[in-house]
Amino acid sequence: MGSLLRMNRLLSSIVESCNCIIDPQLPADDLLMKYQYISDFFIALAYFSIPVELIYFVKKSAVFPYRWVLVQFGAFIVLCGATHLINLWTFNMHTRNVAIVMTTPKALTALVSCITALMLVHIIPDLLSVKTRELFLKKKAAQLDREMGIIRTQEETGRHVRMLTHEIRSTLDRHTILKTTLVELGRTLALEECALWMPTRTGLELQLSYTLRHQNPVGLTVPIQLPVINQVFGTNHVVKISPNSPVARLRPAGKYMPGEVVAVRVPLLHLSNFQINDWPELSTKRYALMVLMLPSDSARQWHVHELELVEVVADQVAVALSHAAILEESMRARDLLMEQNVALDLARREAEMAVRARNDFLAVMNHEMRTPMHAIIALSSLLQETDLTPEQRLMVETILKSSNLLATLINDVLDLSRLEDGSLQLDIGTFNLHALFREVHSLIKPIASVKKLFVTLSLSSDLPEYVIGDEKRLMQILLNVVGNAVKFSKEGNVSISAFVAKSDSLRDPRAPEFFAVPSENHFYLRVQIKDTGIGITPQDIPNLFSKFTQSQALATTNSGGTGLGLAICKRFVNLMEGHIWIESEGLGKGSTAIFIIKLGIPGRANESKLPFVTKLPANHTQMSFQGLKVLVMDENGVSRMVTKGLLTHLGCDVTTVGSRDECLRVVTHEHKVVIMDVSMQGIDCYEVAVVIHERFGKRHGRPLIVALTGNTDRVTKENCMRVGMDGVILKPVSVYKMRSVLSELLEHGVVLES
């Protein structure tokens, strides 16, 4: 009340000071008038303070978009306050000036109020939209919160997947993989039980193979045709199943409701190509079944991210199992391969031992058979040159011919043996091809004339005279093939033709593997031997190049089989990068043997260096060996006697010794030739040759050294040449052969017989 009295006195003083005219018609209730004065004063005060506050906060805000609207509101409020302040004087009489002052703010207030009202029509929707945007942003923020929750859940799921994948793939043992999967799933998802059912080998049942808590006996089986199993196997997603289904009844019954159960299939690798002992044969069903159970004492349910985690883990388990299966198969294959390698290594060693044993046997047989054959042939040849009755001469010739045939057979066996084990190599050199054909013709012609067969030789004009190849093996092929033609022909003729094979004649449909490639450095020689003999049936032709075969036609003629000849010829032709075959129109129509071999062409730069001249038959019978001093060293008494008999028959003065020391003690400058058997047991005959070289020095002052051996291998020949021997003679030796060797040795100072 005191404040009102003070306000009343203040207003009274204001009225008195302004000389206001009080309307005498106003109500006389002074108390009401005082309250109106007080109200207008405070309204004006509020109106003046509100704009100040607006201006203050707008200046503090940098983002408010409606500053000019606030200016209008401020003006409107200030003017409203001014009108209320002016109303303090309206209760008394006032002058015209006061009326003008009162009217002006009211007019301005009216104007600003109308403008502000009009502007609010446009501003209010924006203000409402701000509220709408606020609600939208709140909704968006809530959605972002949910998405962030999903992302966090996915990250958590991904972390668990990575962790589980790492644990699963940390091993390639399938038992460890499956046990680790159950343990990690149980720990990550807080499961009460987790089990894996595997198909049996028959594929008709699922067998309980692994469990998490180990409370259930492993080995339980359920039929694979159960509806719940078909439902799970029919999709690659997790399927919720009843806790009472046969595959889920794995936990003991309790007072709580069982938790939710889900199942998912686990694809298994198709094992048709793998034979793993305890893995099922998967023909129709290729899945295992994984069952996962939530705890029974909670109201927990499966979430989407948990189901996705289970699906991903099932796929990872499938991949890990496939890797484990492949690893197991690889290990099994490795073990099997190791066993096979051990067996192969054992077989290889046995084969090598067999080859060595065979070679040793052949070497011994070669030496041991050539030594008695040397005596037979040498003595037979000596008898042949004595005065004999016709009957005796026929018997001696038969013995000599049979012995030579046996020697040829031994050579063929040794050649075939070396061909089969790959130890035989061609002796490549330059030789006169024309002279070789003429020599073969001169050797075959006397044999054919006995059977009244005509042998003709035809060499084409473009055939090179000098070629590069194995002269000895080519002659062996020709003698074998031409010899067979003469052997199986009773009458008619045998023709030999040789020419350079053209490109169109190199291909043979019977041998598609033979592919000839001519070049400037070599050519292909084609040789055809045609006879008018008994002929061959088509079905017998493929067997002719087999060892010791005999066709039906040959059996009826009592001519014998082809022996090893053609088989060896085929091997020689193959070594010469060629091809051999036989053509015949049938029995009684003759046959044609054809072979193609590859020969080199000597370079023009080397043509002037060729030391070869056409070989003419040497007239060894004209050379005299009377008084020629020869020393023979051989431990075999029979062989010593035979060799001495041959040399004595030729007129030589022969001294024989049986040991190394005796040979070195006896040999002198008077001895022109030393013949030694290099196959003597326990004696290094090569050392004897070295000592003779050292003792007598120069070649013209020492005797010529010749090796007499039954060994036909290349090593023996190379060893003889290495120690400086002047020649090699192969047993057996006839009188004619010994005369030829001595003549060549004395004439040229060297003799080599391969």
Swiss-Prot record:
GO terms for biological process: negative regulation of ethylene-activated signaling pathway. Residues 364-601 form the Histidine kinase domain. Cu cation binds at C80, H84. It catalyses: ATP + protein L-histidine = ADP + protein N-phospho-L-histidine. It is found in: Endoplasmic reticulum membrane. Its main location: endoplasmic reticulum. Keywords: ATP-binding, Copper, Disulfide bond, Endoplasmic reticulum, Ethylene signaling pathway, Kinase, Membrane, Metal-binding, Nucleotide-binding, Phosphoprotein, Receptor, Transferase, Transmembrane, Transmembrane helix, Two-component regulatory system. Residues 173-321 form the GAF domain. InterPro entries: CheY-like_superfamily, ETR, GAF, GAF-like_dom_sf, HATPase_C_sf, His_kinase_dom, HisK_dim/P_dom, HisK_dim/P_sf. GO terms for molecular function: ATP binding; ethylene binding; ethylene receptor activity; metal ion binding; phosphorelay sensor kinase activity. Residues 629-746 form the Response regulatory domain. Its cofactor is Cu cation. The chain crosses the membrane at residues 38-58, 68-88, 108-128. Induction: Constitutively expressed and accumulation not affected by ethylene, silver ions or auxin. Activation probably requires a transfer of a phosphate group between a His in the transmitter domain and an Asp of the receiver domain. Its EC number is 2.7.13.3. The modification 4-aspartylphosphate is found at D677. May act early in the ethylene signal transduction pathway, possibly as an ethylene receptor, or as a regulator of the pathway. This is Ethylene receptor 1. It comes from Solanum lycopersicum. The gene is ETR1.
